[in-house]
Amino acid sequence: PLRGVAMHQDYLGKGWAITERDTDESLALVHEVGANTLRLAHYPHAPHTLQRADEMGLVVWAEAPFVDGVRLSCSDQPATEEFVANVEQQLRELIRQQYSHASIATWSIGNENTMTQGRCGGGDNVTPVLRRLHEVAKAEDPGRATTLADLSLGGQGEGKIRVSGITDVWALNRYYMWYYGDVLGLVRDLDGIHAKYPRQPVGVSEYGAGAALGDHTDNVLGGPPTPFGSPGARAYQPEEYAAHVHERIYEVLASRPFVWGTYVWAMFD
């Protein structure tokens, strides 16, 4: 099975102004944790990253920079022609620039694109764009699978806007035990979706919990941790609780052979 992590291409104290050596150090840690797949979120990463992934035998999820909805306000207004042309161009550039890297297994056409589904009555202006991007990717590279990372607000099944069936494979961003719910919510999501779409492989593109270096506990159930800070108080995110979340979620994932790949969010913070 594909078990791995997602990562950004930044580095402590440097932001994006990183060197190839910084990337090598990051990928060495990816190897150390035993990952065999890497999600390069949420945009094209530097050529050196792909070169090293080729050499290390990692299976790469490469992603176009299409995040959230097609508008910042109401989701019942269609995407403009200019927007669609722009995101199509960026997907084509991603594929044409990185096509020759053997490590790449999937082209991701988007991340959490139903984020605006709760606005304006949950109108759908997203799936037409995603379907078009799938067509673009298959025209550019018929031999590789397309994918996307689906977000259902609150973690409730598919949500109002369904993106299943658009890409060859797909995956879920789910934060049970952190932003909402318990581990049984993930069980219901995965088993229910697999029963409904048994012919389309489903993965988990994001899961996890916050982990602050300065927060620790000897009772992971004594909490409660806080995903967000509040006025006058900072968030409380003990590392041990993050490890507990990973262990519980991973137990669910490992027991479901129909899950094609899983990615912890995130390898580096």
Predicted regions and their residues:
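Substrate-binding clefts and catalytic carboxylate motifs of secreted carbohydrate-active enzymes
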Residues: 1, 31, 103-107, 117-120, ...
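Active-site-adjacent substrate/metal-binding segments within catalytic domains
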Residues: 1-116, 122-131, 146-147, 170, ...
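A short, acidic/glycine-rich surface segment
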Residues: 13-15, 154-158
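Switch/coupling sub-region of P-loop NTPases
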Residues: 96, 157-160
